[in-house]
Every structure is written in structure tokens, then in C-alpha cells.
Design a protein with these regions (language model features):
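Conserved beta-strand hairpin/beta-sheet module of binuclear metal-dependent hydrolase folds
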Residues: 47-92, 167-182
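Active-site- or DNA-interface-adjacent structural scaffold in DNA-acting proteins
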Residues: 24-29, 137
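Active-site-proximal loop/helix segment associated with metal-binding centers of metalloenzymes
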Residues: 65-72, 128-130, 134-139, 184-194
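Active-site HxH/HxHxD metal-binding segment of metal-dependent hydrolases
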Residues: 89-152, 236
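Metallo-beta-lactamase
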Residues: 5-26, 34-37, 83-84, 132, ...
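Short, solvent-exposed secondary-structure boundary motifs
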Residues: 58-70, 130-131, 146, 158-160
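Short, flexible loop segments at the rims of nucleotide/cofactor-binding pockets, characterized by
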Residues: 61-66, 82-88, 101-104, 153-159, ...
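Short Cys/His-rich micro-motifs in 6-15 aa windows
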Residues: 31-44
Length: 239
């Protein structure tokens, strides 16, 4: 087993999409799958590509094709000033249009952000509380997100809960909630992987923030849904 750090080696877990930079562990540090299901980054890029699906004129949903395990959707947001990715695809696809900034909801889905950062000279940012986790250490972050901020029309809100640095975003009438909540058999549940009480408390914070917002669409980790339908499920969850 090669465990020696080497920045030229990168492996992708085909079960969860996690990228391992410079090391080849026996098991995936994110999902625990054995290294028999790993691909080199080059192999991954030859077998998978990243497809963009329009959400609206400013937002594009990014997914690996064919589906790369548990990989979550990333979203490209085009503002008047810059382009942003919210989270990052696991597959490194050089054919994608350049992006100025990669900002994360949390550290579970850093994808191939190190490679896109190098290819596009993108600035990569995450909440500092999630940058210190063990699985984040091989990734490069150019700066840390402030707790709450507004930048080029993108509103960011630090919630904690699912992870210490979890941050959700709103751009115009689109809510980017990632995997804070799951839709399972037409019902909504909180993400079960994290502190239960803090995640529930974060749900109340989210509700306080979004209640007076003019939201039409919700972009989740594997779905895009109209806000009224999503909010009805969310209200049942938090009440």
C-alpha cells in the first residue's frame, strides 16, 4: 500500500466521489470503501464527464455522467461580476468553462477542487471551521468564508449543525441548501450524519432566514425543486 504523500498522485473513490490527494489509503477516509474501488484521477476523467443542466438563466447544475457514486450536485452561479461554483464536482473535466470562485457549503464534497483551482486559477474558499477537519488537510483554500456575507448578489449564511462550518447560500430567488436536509420517500429528514440536536437547531435558523425571502427554487444535493413544495415538507420537519 502506498501511503507516502505525493502531490502528483490523486485517487477518486467511486462509491462516494471523495478525492484523495497525494496518498493511497487502504480505505476511503470519507465513506470507508476499500481501495479496490478507487480510480486514479486520470482514469476517472476518462470514464466520467461533468454535465451541466440549466436551473435558470443564472444557475447551472453540475453532475458527473455517468453518476459517480454518492457525489452531490455542484452549482455554477453566474453573477454580473464573477462566476462561482457552490461545491465542486468530483470528476476533473477540463472541458468545463472556467470559474472564478469555488465556495463550499461544507467539507464533505470538496471534489476535484484542487485541480480546478490550478486549471482555472480559481479562488477556493470554505468556512474555517470545516477547513481544519482531517479530510480537508490535503486541499488548498485561498481564504476563509466569513460567517455571513453578501458578495456579488450571493448571500451566505453560516448555520453550523450538520458540520461546524456549514454554510448555505441564496442567489436572487434560488436557495442552495446542499444536503442539510434529505427528501426520502416524499418526506423530508435532516441529514443523519452529524450532531442531531445541532442539526435541528440549524434548521430553525434556516427557517428564520428564508421566511421573508422571495425564493422560487431550491437546489439540493441531488434534486432541484420548486420552493412551495419544498417549504411544505420543511415546515413539517421543523414543527
Amino acid at each position: 500500500m502506498n501511503t507516502k504523500a505525493n502531490p502528483d498522485n490523486q485517487y477518486v473513490c467511486t462509491i462516494c466521489g471523495f478525492n484523495m490527494i497525494g496518498y493511497y489509503p487502504e480505505y476511503c477516509p470519507f465513506c470507508g470503501a476499500p481501495n479496490t474501488v478507487f480510480l486514479t484521477s486520470e482514469e476517472c476523467s476518462s470514464r466520467y464527464s461533468v454535465k451541466g443542466t440549466p436551473v435558470n438563466k443564472n444557475v447551472l447544475r453540475l453532475n458527473s455522467v455517468p453518476k459517480l457514486g454518492l457525489e452531490h450536485s455542484a452549482y455554477r452561479v453566474t453573477t454580473a461580476e464573477k462566476t462561482y461554483w457552490i461545491d465542486c464536482p468530483s470528476c476533473f473535466d477540463k472541458s468545463l468553462a472556467p470559474v472564478d470562485e469555488i465556495i463550499f457549503t461544507h467539507h464533505h464534497f470538496l471534489g476535484a477542487s484542487n485541480q480546478y483551482r490550478q486549471l482555472f486559477s480559481s479562488k477556493v474558499r470554505i468556512n474555517k471551521l470545516d477547513s481544519v477537519h482531517k479530510i480537508s488537510q490535503a486541499f488548498t483554500f485561498d481564504d476563509f468564508l466569513k460567517d455571513n456575507f453578501i458578495e456579488n448578489g450571493i448571500e451566505a449564511f453560516h448555520i453550523d449543525g450538520h458540520t461546524p462550518g456549514f454554510t448555505f447560500y441564496i442567489f436572487k430567488d434560488v436557495l442552495f441548501i446542499c444536503d442539510y436536509v434529505h427528501i426520502y420517500r416524499e418526506k423530508m429528514i435532516f441529514n443523519p450524519f452529524g450532531p442531531k440536536d445541532k442539526t435541528a437547531a440549524g434548521g430553525q435558523k434556516i427557517n428564520e432566514i428564508i421566511t421573508n425571502k422571495d425564493i422560487k427554487t431550491v437546489c439540493g444535493f441531488k434534486y432541484v425543486q420548486g420552493y412551495p413544495e419544498w417549504k411544505e415538507k420543511f415546515d413539517l420537519l421543523i414543527n
